Amino acid sequence: DLHLGYNIGCRHMEKMVEKINAQNPDLVVVAGDIFDNEYEALENPDRLAAILRGIQSKYGVYACYGNHDIEEKILAGFTFGGKEKKESTIEMDSFLEDAGFTLLRDEYVLIDHSFYLYGRPDYERPGRGIDERKDPQEITADMDLSLPVLVIDHEPRELQELADAGVDADLCGHTHDGQLFPGNLTIKLLWENAYGYLRKENMHNIVTSGVGLFGPNMRVGTKSEICDIMIHFK
């Protein structure tokens, strides 16, 4: 969750890229909410994209969209849109391409002939051109399940279904770990895994609190983070 916009801009991304590169990652994934609803709120999009292009990883940077990756006006940190369907924009897609991100929209890539990475559209707002996202069984239907399957999905939903479909790791965001106390306590009532690590049979689910913020520009009782994951394939 970067939530690029009024609260998060170039200075934050410079620090983030520096910290990511210090980990010497093989793969970088962003599990949605790259934007904070309003594309026009980006601080100098060209410079932001150039900063993000500085992320260094062996296999590249991949992303999926979240429920805030849509065009919707913001006031005082919150959205006040109607109930009509809202979608991602071509400008958002182009920005990610300029930033060196590969956007996965209900599709997968086979990386280094060694493992699959699948990017799911958001459960609530799947985005432009997608009416309903594929179910877990569909996303692995034509995969060689002798190879590891990694999924990026903005919201930590359908965990049992993903495990049943043969997914090995499900990487999520969305919850911000509650962001503000006591939200970090009550959020646990809403999600099977609201933050951190959960093993679901043979599947590993990891939910990060994210880098950015939604609403008020603060955290109380939680921390922004970059999640460094070590995965060993057997």
Role assignments for model-derived ranges:
Residues 2-234:
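Soluble catalytic domains of enzymes that build or remodel membrane lipids, polysaccharides, and related
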